[in-house]
Amino acid sequence: MKAVIYHEFGGSISMATVADPTPEPDGAVIQVEATGLCRSDWHGWRGHDPDIKHFPHVPGHEFAGCVVAIGRDVRRAQIGDRVTMPFVAGCGVCPECRSGNHQVCDAQFQPGFTAWGSFAEFVAVRYADTNLISLPHNMTSIAAAALGCRLATAYRAVTAQGRVQKGDWVAVHGCGGLGLSAVMIAAAVGARVIAVDVRPEPLALAKRLGAEFSLNALDTLDTAAAIHELSSRGADVSLDTLGSTTTFANSVLSLRKRGRHVQVGLLSAEASLPTSPLNRLIAWELEIVGSHGLQTHAYPGLFDLIQSGKLDPTQLIDRTMPLGSAPHELASLDNYRGCGVTVFSLVSPT
């Protein structure tokens, strides 16, 4: 098969011909029809993810396609199924999985990180019966790949961890793919959304995707104070989807009393949290929670939003490109100035 491959962290990325994968006893092989490009893929290539331990390596973790082979122990998944899967695939048997929290599985499988990923014609996955998700018949593979880790992660962050309700004020700090996904989902469930970023282009897109207000943090003297003014008393829920000391502090300080902060963006290992928002945490009885991925059993709620017409994942897609573009696009991702998500299509146009 053809695959995108690199042999060292930060090294050259190229298309190569490698052996087709075979399924593990509990696994399956998926013929990839579409796969999304995510900043996590760039972090993996740069050596920021400890799960990548062996070379050569194939990146990619947001995909949709068709099951072409299954392991001997697989009972639910069938050859020919059109599927996607969470980027964190739970084993199904550890204590966390048994409690329904597959997204923090003790033995999680992550395509593109713990194993070769989906920037290839085929991808082998583990724990197939627990994690493969059948796609709605009217959902294209490109739309399903756009769900990826961004829309799925944002769905859990907004609805489960943030517990956003209709009429809530929700602030989203950082309007990359994850932040824009959070804007879309919060708006879809009836929240009043304030989007924050430092670039006008993603802020304009956030408004088109449902944000009621947008704030350019570079042009705002006090972002948290501006959110308090717009919402009258502060956000009910605020999400840091970027991951920096500044966005963390702004998110916490923008909350009303007894509000909820959801940390979704990853902070660097060198980041030190400022004391001001942590002191506010006590005085105002604020909640701070993390959010990581989405369990397989929670996907029907996400699909319901899409099928109802309240959420359209294709609105998040900025570019659709052939897989051959992936080496250049992955290496250039840190300088990408567009808005939205790039999806690589492996299906020839008809």
Task: List the predicted regions and their residue ranges.
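Glycine-rich beta-strand-centered segment in the early N-terminal region that forms part
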Residues: A19-T35, H48-P95, P136-M139
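Short, surface-exposed secondary-structure boundary micro-motifs
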Residues: E33-T35, R72, V88, H102, ...
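Short glycine-centered segments of the SAM/dcSAM-binding site in methyltransferase folds
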Residues: R82, W169, G259-H261, E287
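Mid-domain Rossmann-like dinucleotide-binding core that forms the NAD(H)/NADP(H) cofactor-binding site
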Residues: R82, M139-D219, A225
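C-terminal hydrophobic helical "lid"/dimerization subdomain
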Residues: A249-L253, T296-T350
